[in-house]
Design a protein with these regions (language model features):
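Active-site loop/helix belt of alpha/beta enzymes
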Residues: 138-277, 351, 379
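Active-site-proximal loop/turn and secondary-structure-junction residues that shape catalytic pockets
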Residues: 46-48, 69-70, 90-91, 111-113, ...
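Short beta-strand segments
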Residues: 43, 130-136, 182-184, 220-222, ...
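Short acidic, glycine/serine/threonine-rich loops at helix termini
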Residues: 53, 76, 96-101, 118-121, ...
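Electropositive phosphate-/nucleotide-binding environments in soluble metabolic enzymes
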Residues: 16-23, 46, 50, 65-68, ...
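Hydrophobic "anchor" residues on beta-strands that sit immediately upstream
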Residues: 41, 130, 218, 254, ...
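A charged N-terminal "starter" segment
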Residues: 1-129, 168-177, 204-207, 211, ...
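Charged (often Lys/Glu-rich) extended helix/loop segments that serve as interaction or gating elements
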Residues: 243, 252-413
């Protein structure tokens, strides 16, 4: 991929996505469940660009949404309503009504209160709501605490006994149709053992429900498959799928999974231009035009993305300590223009001297990059570009100042 040409053509900061890589990841995951009925529902929150959603819908993907906005995005991008799932711990009435009116595949419920509210709304609309219940198996996903969701101390889902009670209520309700069961224990999971253990617990509950004449059709294992940012080892897809399927013996269910980061994470790159270097005593900084409002993961999660620089036609990667003196690489922080000490994209990285206009490329930026960006410091958000079959095309233009203030200007009087 010619990052220098893309930066010259579209400017920086810039997100670039490799659509061919996304297709490869989707097909690899889908094929790992080839012996079973399965549905891969892409987690829209990871990267919600309409062109990304349209591309994945064309491959046959379903969509896991956590707001009515994401449901509407998926529909706008061409998704079939019967391949959309609405999740999320706090759904408003208008979101539940929209899901009911558009007859999506199922609504993942997270509490008894939510079930009662949905039942009331379905009755008002004269509908029967297809539901799944998110079961919290009390499993430690061994990931960052901000993205761990499968423990009793987390806000997500209900315990096994509460789930049974909810399913029995739904079975006897004319306005609820229990069709699925759901669990999701966390994100960026690189050890599949907790996922398989959670599947075992939920599968046993599914057998109990089937015995009680509750026809569970969809077994949703959630998402969370991790990717390589640095030195991690990526889970083996065959072992992941077979570990789940081994627990489903005798169960006639469609397996649903909800990957987000796994599909788009390593398909994305964040390009930012060097403004200048500066030194505070012995501390070296490379100041770039990208910032925490563009890519907040390093500041928010202490995430460490691999980076490299492009200078004078050369690709300059981080190097090991023994190479530093020979190549004139020195430790530095890559920081942005925002008025926060937490505004950094990388810390303590070994890079060579860089000049204004050189590029810094941050890898693994396709998930939770642009999706979590903001207009902090009244900065317009970056443009997004897709590359497919060697061709590049704009999929979101750069925000202008007028875009940023558009919703406020009319109130100036």
């Amino acid at each position: 991929m010619d990052f220098t040409n893309l930066a010259q053509k579209y400017g920086t900061p810039l997100y670039v996505y490799d659509f061919d890589y996304m297709a490869h990841r989707y097909e690899a995951l889908k094929s790992s469940f080839h012996a079973r009925k399965s549905l891969v529902c892409y987690a829209v929150k990871a990267n919600s660009n309409l062109s990304v959603l349209k591309f994945l819908a064309g491959l046959g993907a379903g969509f896991d949404c956590v707001s009515v906005g994401e449901v509407r995005r998926a529909l706008l991008a061409g998704a079939k309503s019967y391949q959309i799932i609405l999740s999320g711990v706090g759904k408003r009435d208008d979101e539940l009504k929209f899901a009911l009116e558009n007859e999506i595949l199922m609504i993942n419920l997270e509490s008894e209160a939510e079930m009662n509210r949905l039942e009331t709304l379905a009755k008002q609309l004269g509908k029967s709501a297809r539901i799944s219940i998110r079961v919290n198996p009390d499993i430690d996903a061994k990931t960052h605490p901000y993205i761990s969701t499968g423990l009793n101390e987390n806000k997500f889902g209900v315990d096994l006994q509460t789930a049974k009670k909810m399913y029995l209520h739904a079975k006897n309700s004319p306005h609820l149709e229990p069709v699925g069961i759901h669990s999701h224990i966390g994100s960026q999971i690189t050890d599949i053992k907790p996922v398989i253990e959670a599947a075992k617990i939920v599968a046993n509950l599914t057998r109990e429900l089937k015995a009680a004449q509750i026809d569970i059709k969809f077994f949703d294992v959630g998402g969370g498959i991790g990717i390589v940012y640095g030195d991690e080892s990526e889970p083996d897809l065959y072992e992941y799928a077979q570990g789940i399927l081994a627990n489903l013996s005798g169960l006639d269910v469609t397996v649903v999974c909800e990957p987000g980061r796994f599909i788009v994470g390593n398909a994305g790159y964040f390009l930012t231009s060097v403004l200048y270097e500066k030194f505070n005593k012995n501390k070296r900084f490379i100041v770039v035009d990208g910032a925490m409002n563009d890519l907040i993961r390093p500041s928010l999660y202490q995430a460490r993305h691999k980076i490299f620089a492009l200078s004078g036609g050369n690709t300059l990667c981080e190097c090991k300590t023994e190479q530093l003196r020979e190549l004139k690489f020195t430790p530095c922080d890559v920081v942005g223009p925002i008025c926060e000490s937490g505004d950094f994209l990388a810390k303590d990285r070994n890079l060579p001297p860089l000049n204004p206009g050189d590029l810094v490329v941050i890898k693994s930026a396709g998930a939770y990059g642009f999706a979590m960006s903001s207009n902090y410091n009244t900065r317009g958000r970056a443009a997004e570009v897709a590359v497919k079959g060697g061709e590049d095309f704009l999929i979101r233009r750069r925000e202008s100042f007028e875009d940023v203030v558009a919703l406020e200007r009319e109130f100036l009087g």
